[in-house]
């Protein structure tokens, strides 16, 4: 029997009560990178934040933010 793939998205977050998830996406992206800075790139503790932002954020945004982080122009508090 084949393994089933379970699809999940980020859980509801009281800080983001509306259907527009832009801030939720941005916050989860920042939380992930803060976590990896504090605990290291390979930390399993950070994986949940990665899952959340990957589920919420459009890929184009993530690509742009990654480029900005690499060039030192990312607008968020990392």
UniProtKB/Swiss-Prot annotation:
Annotated ranges, domain CHCH: 22-65
Alphabetical keyword list: Disulfide bond, Mitochondrion
Domain of life of the organism encoding this protein: Eukaryota
Cited InterPro entries: COX6B-like (IPR048280), CX6/COA6-like_sf (IPR036549), Cyt_c_oxidase_su6B (IPR003213)
Cysteines engaged in disulfide bonds, as pairs: 25-57, 35-46
Family per record: Belongs to the cytochrome c oxidase subunit 6B (TC 3.D.4.8) family.
Protein name: Cytochrome c oxidase subunit 6b-2
Annotated source species: Arabidopsis thaliana
Classification lineage: Eukaryota, Viridiplantae, Streptophyta, Embryophyta, Tracheophyta
